[in-house]
Structure formats: C-alpha cells, structure tokens
C-alpha cells in the first residue's frame, strides 16, 4: 500500500464508494436474488399438494416480491408471504425470528444507508479542512456497511435453506445477479473502508512526525539564547570574575599602594574596639616599612659612592 500514491488511493476510495453504493442499491431494488420453482397464482381452498406441484413454474424473486417466468402468469409479480398459514413452525422458534428478519430486510437497507453516508464523507473530504478525520468517518461507514451487508446475505441464505418447500430438492433454486451484486458490494465496501482507514493512519503519522520535528526544533532554539544575549552574558560574567578584577603585574609594581600602608592610614570607628592583636600588627607593619624605606636609600648611596659609576668629564 505504501507503493501507491495518495492520489491513487483517493481515486480508489471515490470510485469504490460509488460502485459499492450503486451495486447495493441495484441489488435491493431488483427482483433477481433467487431463481426457484413455485406457484404464481393465488392459493385456493381446493388446492392440494399434487395440483400445486403440477402448476409450479420458474420464478425469480427479490427481497419483497416474486415474479413468474413461465406459464399463464408470466410476468406477474406478487408480494412474498414470509409467514404462510400452512407452514409448520411455531412463533417462538428460531425459524420464525429468521423469517421476521428476512421479511423486514433491515440489514440490506441499513447497508445502503451506511454506504450513502460513507460516500458523502468521501465527497466532503475533498473540500473539508480536516479531511483526514472525514476520511476516517468514511472508512468506519464503509466497514459497517459491509458487515451489515454480509449479515443480510447470511440471513437470506438461511431463510431460503429453511424453507419447508425447498427441503426435498437440493437443486430447486439458484442465486441470481442481484444476489451477486450484493456480494460484490460487500467486497468493494470492505476494500474501500480499509483503504480509507489506511489513508487516515498514514496522514496521522505524517502529521505526528511533523509536529514532533517542529517541537524538537522549537525546544532546540529555546535552549540556545541569541548571539547578542550570549555575548552580553559572557562579557558580564568576565567582568564579575575575581580574576578580572585583579590588577596586572605592571600596575602592581608601579601604581599600587601596599595594604600595610592603607592599614596605617585607616582608623577604627570605635577606639574601644582596638585590641592587642591590632597593636602588634601595626608595630610589625611599621617596622617592615622602615626596613623597606631604608633599603633603597642605602642602595642609592652605595651606587653614588662607587667610583665606577661616577661620571668623569674629559679635559
């Protein structure tokens, strides 16, 4: 089914829907379901079994009436009596229920109705916005119509097999083209229903894959911030790092003031909070500064007193 194009599938669905509805409508409306031998004239009280046997002619019947093909009543049709008075059955038996269902022909009529609605759904799928949902409805209608059709055919066969007048002869009846039209309508309806459901499943899978890919794409772009925002965050993070706030070695050598000098010029707000530890630290820092300040002076004097470093003026 994947090898077929979607347009071919829709063409099969449309043509199949029209064919199934047409065949079933013709089958229900015609009288060529069954060919059998029977009496065409109306029953009378003086009739016996022998006279009726001699007057039997070939007839064709549908769902509601029987027509004669031979004899003096050729071409005459009469309504089918599904509940004859001389029939040997009780009203509470399964045969009576079968005859009642056969007389009502509810399943063939229901099949035609479902096929009609299925065809409307197929036609509406060409214009409706959410066409895949309409196609699913059409598939459900056609599958249900096929099931109703086959149930009606089974009931019809069972009713004919259970006819008391047909039991003594195995070859006393045969099925006509109307019956086969109904059978072909069942096959086509089931094929159309399966194709319609397959179209819906394929379309649903495509929409699901498309929505899944769009969702993944949106989530991927949501995780990645814009370039400017990332650059701004990166620059701000660099400015907030502790290493970025440290001074370079050159600035440390020439433009910084030792922390001990700063501590010498800072005063405590509360003189009562000065402890022995702070006094010792200040004395130690003061001694260190004296040593630090005296070292360059002595070094300068040694350089000045060195005779190699003296400048001599030529005479």
From Swiss-Prot:
InterPro entries membership: CACNG_subunit, PMP22/EMP/MP20/Claudin, VDCC_gsu
Positions of disulphide bridges: none
Keyword field: Calcium, Calcium channel, Calcium transport, Ion channel, Ion transport, Membrane, Phosphoprotein, Transmembrane, Transmembrane helix, Transport, Voltage-gated channel
An example Gene Ontology molecular-function term: channel regulator activity
Main location: membrane
Membrane topology term: Multi-pass membrane protein
Keyword Ion transport: yes
Record has Electron transport as a keyword: no
Domain of life: Eukaryota
Subcellular location(s) per record: Membrane
Span list, region Disordered: 232-252
GO cellular component: AMPA glutamate receptor complex; glutamatergic synapse; postsynaptic density membrane; Schaffer collateral - CA1 synapse; somatodendritic compartment
PANTHER family for the chain: VOLTAGE-DEPENDENT CALCIUM CHANNEL GAMMA SUBUNIT, VOLTAGE-DEPENDENT CALCIUM CHANNEL GAMMA-3 SUBUNIT
Family: Belongs to the PMP-22/EMP/MP20 family. CACNG subfamily.
Function, in words: Regulates the trafficking and gating properties of AMPA-selective glutamate receptors (AMPARs). Promotes their targeting to the cell membrane and synapses and modulates their gating properties by slowing their rates of activation, deactivation and desensitization. Does not show subunit-specific AMPA receptor regulation and regulates all AMPAR subunits. Thought to stabilize the calcium channel in an inactivated (closed) state.
Name of the protein described by the UniProt record: Voltage-dependent calcium channel gamma-3 subunit
Organism, as annotated: Bos taurus
